[in-house]
Amino acid sequence: MNATHCILALQLCLLAISGCSSQVPIIEEIENLKRYFNSSNSAVGDSKDVVLHVLRNWQEDGDTKVIDVQIVSFYFKLFEALKGNQAIEKSINAIRADLIANFFNNSEAKYDGFMSIMKIEVNDPQIQSKAINELVKVMGHLSPRVTLRKRKRSRCCFGGGNRLNKNNPASTI
């Protein structure tokens, strides 16, 4: 095992521990991965974090959802790269299921949509053209919404109408 695998497994462990709903089984699966990758704290302690340093910086801004998406994407790519490894497949599947439960609210449709976007080939000119064409709508969806509500004024209370107002006894005269 090279150092990169060890670091990635440790980061996976830390991310999974931070948000697991059923922590005990997931922690056991993470420990299994740590043993497989020999990723104890002493083995990977001299290296820089893979994703945690970025996550810490974003937490200061309070805007973590964007970076959470990137980190989850990273781990799903890692799981895909490790697919077929019988020694750790059970652990990876359990952790993947827990991430889906926590990040996608147990929605397979949301997970499938997320994965389909991750797999889009960005070097394809037709995809590039379609994506640029959709960009205005995407930017509109992502930008903060300004709620412009017109206030409706009641004409009955201000002399502008002759409707009865049940809350104003003077309007019945």
UniProtKB/Swiss-Prot annotation:
Q: What is the annotated quaternary arrangement, including any partners?
A: Homodimer. Interacts with IFNGR1 (via extracellular domain); this interaction promotes IFNGR1 dimerization.
Q: Which residues are glycosylated?
A: 38, 105
Where's it found, cell-wise?
Answer: Secreted
Entry similarity comment: Belongs to the type II (or gamma) interferon family.
Q: Which UniProt keywords apply?
A: Antiviral defense, Cytokine, Glycoprotein, Growth regulation, Pyrrolidone carboxylic acid, Secreted, Signal
Q: In this UniProt entry, which cysteines form S-S bonds? A: none
Q: In terms of domain of life, where is this protein from?
A: Eukaryota
Instruction: Give expression by tissue.
Output: Released primarily from activated T lymphocytes.
Q: Might you report a single GO cellular component term?
A: extracellular space
The signal peptide stretch is: 1-22
Q: Kindly give the Pfam families that the UniProt entry links to this protein.
A: IFN-gamma (PF00714)
**Which residues in this protein are found as Pyrrolidone carboxylic acid?**
23
Q: Which organism is it from?
A: Meriones unguiculatus
GO molecular function terms listed in the Swiss-Prot or TrEMBL record: cytokine activity; type II interferon receptor binding
- Give the InterPro entries listed for this entry: 4_helix_cytokine-like_core, Interferon_gamma
Q: What does this protein do?
A: Type II interferon produced by immune cells such as T-cells and NK cells that plays crucial roles in antimicrobial, antiviral, and antitumor responses by activating effector immune cells and enhancing antigen presentation. Primarily signals through the JAK-STAT pathway after interaction with its receptor IFNGR1 to affect gene regulation. Upon IFNG binding, IFNGR1 intracellular domain opens out to allow association of downstream signaling components JAK2, JAK1 and STAT1, leading to STAT1 activation, nuclear translocation and transcription of IFNG-regulated genes.
Q: Which GO terms describe its biological process?
A: adaptive immune response; defense response to virus; humoral immune response
This one is known as Interferon gamma
